[in-house]
């Protein structure tokens, strides 16, 4: 198994290190355009192997030839968000980067599974799929795993309980229009609405929607990377080990939820072939309306981007 991580910034490097620690690949390549950065970080990771008890071969490179025959490619490359900047502000800048990266990947790997992390996430996943020519099942955006984790953590914090006992489902685009579905949110099987007031749940939902921006505002420079990287690793692990995990990911829908041809976050089964099944869960009309509205925003941005490319 060979995995390549494109982008040696905080998200990319943290993802690579966690993948190496879990020994999900025999060979792991960390690639970046800046000379020396991926080489130095990869060597540092590799040297931690004797103490961390892993044997993953970690290589840093600036040459896409070193990514040849990758089974999975994680794209984290792109410009970071700055305070006050929405994911949509990044649209045109990062689309060019993702398009270039995907083209170079496909020159050296015939049929990889691509996991996109670059923002604006749903739109960049569309860009990568469009450029790659791969079946839609093999191009997946990391969004709902992270958004659901944030919602779960806020609920656990509110109740003072273990995060492991909280389950949540956050659908839609990875942005301000995401849809945390309260009816599918539980604590040890107990509906969260039985434990927290509707008013307080609404506040936690809003905090989840702005969770990324909250961290950006704290950091001043850069954005979240520990939780995003951990979310990517959960997805990759399900693919590599064919675990068939049901995770919320940004995938191209084919009529489910009344949405067609748009990448948006919904529950899917992830296995060795990528997206193996899309689950169409029953939603209240209000949540369905929000999901469709979220998808419409993604679709409009994709069409605007396609038009700008001529």
Curated annotation (Swiss-Prot):
UniProt source species: Chlorobaculum tepidum (strain ATCC 49652 / DSM 12025 / NBRC 103806 / TLS) (Chlorobium tepidum)
EC number: 1.1.1.37
UniProt similarity note: Belongs to the LDH/MDH superfamily. MDH type 3 family.
Name listed for the protein in its UniProt record: Malate dehydrogenase
Binding site for NAD(+): 7-12, 32, 94, 117-119
Gene Ontology MF terms in the entry: L-lactate dehydrogenase activity; L-malate dehydrogenase (NAD+) activity
Cited PANTHER family: L-2-HYDROXYCARBOXYLATE DEHYDROGENASE (NAD(P)(+)), L-LACTATE DEHYDROGENASE
Active site residues of this protein: 174 (proton acceptor)
Subunit and interaction comment: Homotetramer; arranged as a dimer of dimers.
Top EC category: oxidoreductase
Keywords: NAD, Oxidoreductase, Tricarboxylic acid cycle
Function: Catalyzes the reversible oxidation of malate to oxaloacetate.
Reactions catalysed: (S)-malate + NAD(+) = oxaloacetate + NADH + H(+)
Pfam families the UniProt entry points to: Ldh_1_C, Ldh_1_N
Residues that hold substrate according to the record: 81, 87, 119, 150
GO biological process: lactate metabolic process; tricarboxylic acid cycle
């Amino acid at each position: 198994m060979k995995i390549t991580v494109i982008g040696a910034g905080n998200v990319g490097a943290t993802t690579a290190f966690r993948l190496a620690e879990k020994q999900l690949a025999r060979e792991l390549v960390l690639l970046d355009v800046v000379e020396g950065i991926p080489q130095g970080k990869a060597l540092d990771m590799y040297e931690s192997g004797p103490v961390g008890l892993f044997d993953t071969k970690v290589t840093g490179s600036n040459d896409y030839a070193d990514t040849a025959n990758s089974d999975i490619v994680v794209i984290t490359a792109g410009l970071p968000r700055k305070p006050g900047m929405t994911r949509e502000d990044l649209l045109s800048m990062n689309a060019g980067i993702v398009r270039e990266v995907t083209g170079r990947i496909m020159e050296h790997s015939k049929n990889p599974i691509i996991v996109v992390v670059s923002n604006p996430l749903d739109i960049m996943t569309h860009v990568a799929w469009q450029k790659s020519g791969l079946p839609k099942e093999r191009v997946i955006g990391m969004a709902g795993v992270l958004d659901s984790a944030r919602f779960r953590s806020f609920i656990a914090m509110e109740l003072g309980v273990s995060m492991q006992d909280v389950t949540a489902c956050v659908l839609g685009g990875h942005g301000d229009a995401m849809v945390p579905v309260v009816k599918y949110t539980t604590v040890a099987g107990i509906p969260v609405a039985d434990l927290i007031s509707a008013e307080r749940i609404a506040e936690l939902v809003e905090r989840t929607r702005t969770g990324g921006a909250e961290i950006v505002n704290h950091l001043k420079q850069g954005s979240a990377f520990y939780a995003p990287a951990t979310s990517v690793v959960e997805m990759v692990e399900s693919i590599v080990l064919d675990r068939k995990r049901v995770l919320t990911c940004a995938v191209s829908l084919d009529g489910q939820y009344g949405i067609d041809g748009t990448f948006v976050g919904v529950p899917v089964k992830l296995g060795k072939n990528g997206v193996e099944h899309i689950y169409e869960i029953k939603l209240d009309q209000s949540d369905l309306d929000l999901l469709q509205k979220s998808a419409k925003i993604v679709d409009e941005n994709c069409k605007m981007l396609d038009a700008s490319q001529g």
